């Protein structure tokens, strides 16, 4: 039995072809932070006949089962990424829409200190930073615009 079959069963979901195909697409590195519509188009490009309503339904089921995490970035539409064991935060460029994942121990520690100051035990958190490209919006045409500086 494939790993994806087992992952669906472990999440309490029946193994179906649409669920398997959607999970396969979500596992592709270029499909992080993908909307339902983008995922649907990707499935069409791959020759899969899965309707948009099914894509929405499966993504909601995956979200409920903890297979994916739903994010609501600027712009109003939900995007999805596979749930991971490691925590990370997001930096979103308002010019091109690129979403950059990052982890920073100093930020994590500071959040814990703030919670402790107010006598709150953190159970979860998410941090979204929004900004505009430092290169006057030219990031839309430059695939390297958001590479980390050395």
Curated annotation (Swiss-Prot):
State the Gene Ontology terms under molecular function: DNA-binding transcription factor activity; transcription cis-regulatory region binding; zinc ion binding
* Region (Dimerization) location: 85-143
Q: What is its main location?
A: cytoplasm
| Positions contributing to Zn(2+) binding | 33, 81, 90, 93, 96, 101
Give compartment(s). Cytoplasm
Q: List the disulfide bonds.
A: none
Gene Ontology terms, cellular component aspect?
cytosol
Name a single GO biological process: negative regulation of DNA-templated transcription
Pfam family name, one: FUR
Residues binding Fe cation: 87, 89, 108, 125
Renumbered residue ranges of the record's region DNA-binding: 1-84
Q: How does it assemble?
A: Homodimer.
User: What's the stated role of this polypeptide?
Assistant: Fur acts as a repressor, employing Fe(2+) as a cofactor to bind the operator of the iron transport operon.
Q: Which family does it belong to?
A: Belongs to the Fur family.
NCBIfam families noted in UniProt: PRK09462.1 (NF006999)
What is the protein name for this chain?
A: Ferric uptake regulation protein
